[in-house]
Amino acid sequence: MDQDSYSLMRGGLVHRLLHATGALGGSAHLSLWLALLLVAVSLLPMLLLTAVDGTLLPKHGAMSLLGDYATLARLLLALPLLVIAAPRSDALLRNAFRQLSHASLVPARRLPRLHALLQQVRRGRDGWVPEALCVLIAVLPLFLSGTALSLLPGVIDWRLDGAVLTPAGRWYEWVAVPLFRLVALLWLWRYLLWTWLLWRLPRSGLVLHAEHPDGAGGLAFLGIAQERFAVLSMAGGLLLAGACLNHITWLGQTLYDVRHLLAGYVIGATALLVAPLLLLMPLLMRTKRHALYRFDALGNRAAALFDQRWQAGAASAADEDSLLDHGDASAFADFSGVYKGLASMAVVPLDRWNLLWIALYALLPLCPLVLLAMSVDELVSKLVGILV
């Protein structure tokens, strides 16, 4: 399929299994149905099992399933988010792949080098070994540590009956958590493929023009594409928000106690998502530096000619003309505008809006903590105190 040639998500062991079952040829809303299926497989058995043993609904001093906000955030929010966001993210990444091939960024004689690079990415996407390793990593903690549960000290947990896993706890540890890990690892593998592509891209023979109106030598579209991976930071933010809410609810901690953790997560997640674009910085810096050298020399010649014509003295034909009526001033102003645009060229294909959106993806899941950690009246009074 032609569209799959430029797709980063479609391919690999899991995609081939879905294709073999005929699932990919059905509904146009496949990702929604798949997300519902994964949520049902991971969560419904636990709802039934906890309802049977009496740990479904909240009890005083004991954390029930419906009171375990970390589990609900993982299975009800983060898991379907990663599945549903994949097609939309893939569409934008696919456009970025096409842009690399069709935007005249590579001279015709070097196109085979770029096509070979894209083919290597497709082979990495379609290979069964990476996704088989993802499956292995997803289940490996079960065999290494015996239990992968993260328990709150001094809190009775719905997953344990004494020191033994309950049936719902076994389903959570053996099915739900590995399933979530697998989906997250598939996303991370695509992210590593994309990062590898950005690392190799400067070696593919790109010819950039510092005068490009996008302010990034023609590579600004990569910053837009990078935003698509911010869904990873949103999913991580949901997990962190659920864990912090558990600590606030069951351990008596406050939002102030976890402020450094929350701030560190937003800053760290944003930095990790922006970091791959820094691999293009040497190429963009070199392009900008060489262009500044050329335009400096050209500007010197243009300024000298301008001075010679209009400021060299009165005994010339220039005295008979008006500077306002002549095209020299307009041409020099146009040149100055081009030079200023060149001097402000970004050395990373990322503008402030790209950075803002990436940071917001990490921040938004944490915002409900503010509403849950304090009353609305208290929040309004503090806002009024700040503003007034």
Protein language model regions, located:
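Short aromatic-rich membrane-water interface segments that cap or initiate transmembrane helices
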Residues: 160-180
